[in-house]
Amino acid sequence: MSAGPHRTVTELPVAEGWDFGDFPYGLEPLTLPEPPHEPAADVPDVLCAEPAPGGARTSCPRTGPAPGLPELAHQLFWFRWITGHQLTFAIWQLLGHALHQAHARPDPGPSLRAMTDLTRAYTAMLLYTGSCPKDVYSDVIRPSMFLQHRGFSGTWAPDFVPVRRLLRGRKTPWHETPEGGRLADEVRLYHLVHSGVAAKLVPGGRSLLQDTAPTARPHDPRMQALVYDNYFLTLRADVPTAEVVEQLRRRLAAVRLDVSVNGLYPGL
C-alpha cells in the first residue's frame, strides 16, 4: 500500500489466491485525480500495451457454478457492480488523456489505437458490471442507488464528461482515417452492448432519473459528482497517472480471478 497521504492501494492481488479487499469479493476505495478536461503536460503518452509473450490470453469462461446462497450472489455481483465501475472510471481517465494527446500530436495514430483498445476495455466492463441476474439488480443494486439519491444517474459520472462526445458517436477529426474508422467501430460496438445490458437489467427502459420528479434532482453538477463518487467508493486527490494505472491493474487482476472461477455468468 502506498505510504503517501492519499493511501492508495496499488499492489497486485497474488496469483494463487484472493487478495483484494479484506475478504473474497470485498471492496476497496479508488483514488483518482480530477477528470482530464484539459491536456496535462505531466501525463505520459497513453499507448497500446505490448502484446503478451507468445500471444497468450487469459480465457474468460462464459459460465461457472451458481452461488450457493442468495447472500453469496449478492456479495459477488455487488463486487462486480462497484469494482467494474471503478475500472470504468480509470479507463475513462486514460481515454480522456489519449484523446487530448491525439489532438496535440502531429501523428495521432498511436493515440487513436490506444483509444480503440480503451473503448473495447470499457465495453468489456459493461458486460462485467451487467452480468448480474435481473433479480439481483432489481432487489439489491437498483434500490441501493435509489437510497443514495432518488434520481441517481450514470450521467453524473465526472470522468465521463471529457469523453462524452467521443462515446456518443460524434464525428472526430480522424473519422476518415483507418485508425479513426476502427475507433468508430468500437464506439458502435459499445452502443450495442450498452443497449443490450440496459434492456436486460431494466426491461421497462426507465432509469431512476426518468422516474424522479424534477424537484428531486440535484441541480448542482458538483453535488451530482460527489454523490456519484461517494456511491462508488471513489475519492479525488492529486495522485499521479502511474498510481491510477496501478489501481486499474490491481482491479483487473481481481476481476480475472473472479471470472476464472465463476465465469462471466455464474449458474447460467
Kindly give the residue locations of the regions a language model identified.
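Surface-exposed peri-terminal alpha-helical interaction modules
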Residues: 1-268
